Amino acid sequence: MHIVLEFFLVTFRVLWAFVLAAGKWLLRPKDKSVAGQVCLITGAGSGLGRLFALEFARRRAQLVLWDINSQSNEETAEMVRNIYRELEAEDSARRANSSAEEEVLPCCNLKVYTYTCDVGKRESVYSTAERVRREVGDVYLLLNNAGVVSGHHLLECPDELIERTMMVNCHAHFWTTKAFLPKMMELNHGHIVSVASSLGLFSTAGVEDYCASKFGVVGFHESLSHEIKASDKDGIKTTLVCPYLVDTGMFRGCRIRKEIEPFLPPLKPDYCVKQAMRAILTDQPMICTPRLMYIVTCMKSILPFEAVVCMYRFLGADKCMYPFIAQRKQATNNNEAKNGI
């Protein structure tokens, strides 16, 4: 009898979860504040990482930027400083124009910290994380964004590049999370964001290493989310970001069928980041961009494999990475010829 009652209770909770999800979809929750909170972003020197940094800066977060390229990372930091200066000017203007009765925002007094770190190396992650704790303080939001792509067919890809892809795209999430999650657990306060890819939900030919790394991120993130829930740490949130192809140049040359491409073009980086920010600031567990990716993932799960192959061929998705791989190979050959290799 006890298990029967529990079954009905679970059924009610499942249905209630659907109601809450529908309510959040219809009535968007208010964005939470990250003002003054320490937000660490990996791969902040370019692409989505840079755009995430600028978005969090506009929301007055205290930023810690990691990248393997110190020059590009510093360029992002200077953009962040410009935003901070603009915010400080706005605060000063408000104080000057406000009456005594009006509440005035305090001065920003925000700083951005840059660290050169190779997230593909465990020792580099742990040593840099220790510096962050010592020089900045506790990290509230960890955004794992750093990623690489080899751009080779499996049988032509050097083993070292496969290992590098797995280390940077997947293993780094383990190292950074192990470095910063303990304090979040202690305080029951934090947020972990994993930037994966639609290629972590379904795959295509020619990017076996990249797909494996992103599938790994999705599995890691889902298991981590369950572990946090099992620990009853309801103050720690997680968000999984799975965008479709983003027009950052990382997959330049990738093409689906030309008749279909106008309906499913590469995502603009700004749009992708704004959608992800909306999910992060409302504690949404997962965001796929565009929403069509939810349907594709569901269909891939229920359709026979041959049916999926048929759909891929119709969309031109079966060999969509081949032009990208050819361009990367040509660029490599040109570079070797230029350097006399």
From Swiss-Prot:
Similarity-based family: Belongs to the short-chain dehydrogenases/reductases (SDR) family.
Q: Which Gene3D superfamilies match?
A: NAD(P)-binding Rossmann-like Domain
Q: What is this protein called?
A: Retinol dehydrogenase 10-A
Q: Which GO terms describe its molecular function?
A: all-trans-retinol dehydrogenase (NADP+) activity; oxidoreductase activity, acting on the CH-OH group of donors, NAD or NADP as acceptor
According to its UniProt record, where is this protein located?
Microsome membrane; Endoplasmic reticulum membrane
Binding-site residues, NADP(+)? 40-64
Matching entries from InterPro entries are given as: NAD(P)-bd_dom_sf (IPR036291), Sc_DH/Rdtase_CS (IPR020904), SDR_fam (IPR002347)
Instruction: Kindly list the positions annotated as binding substrate.
Output: 197
Signal sequence span per UniProt?
A: none
Q: What Pfam families does the annotation carry?
A: adh_short
Q: Is Transmembrane there in the keyword field? A: yes
EC numbers? 1.1.1.300
Q: Which organism is it from?
A: Xenopus laevis (African clawed frog)
Membrane topology type: Single-pass membrane protein
Q: Which keywords has UniProt assigned to this entry?
A: Endoplasmic reticulum, Membrane, Microsome, NADP, Oxidoreductase, Signal-anchor, Transmembrane, Transmembrane helix
Pathway, according to UniProt? Cofactor metabolism; retinol metabolism
What reaction gets catalysed by this protein? all-trans-retinol + NADP(+) = all-trans-retinal + NADPH + H(+)
Q: Name one GO cellular component term.
A: lipid droplet
Give the transmembrane ranges: 3-23
Q: Where is the active site?
A: 210 (proton acceptor)
Q: What does this protein do?
A: Retinol dehydrogenase with a clear preference for NADP. Converts all-trans-retinol to all-trans-retinal. Has no detectable activity towards 11-cis-retinol, 9-cis-retinol and 13-cis-retinol.
The chain's disulfide connectivity reads none
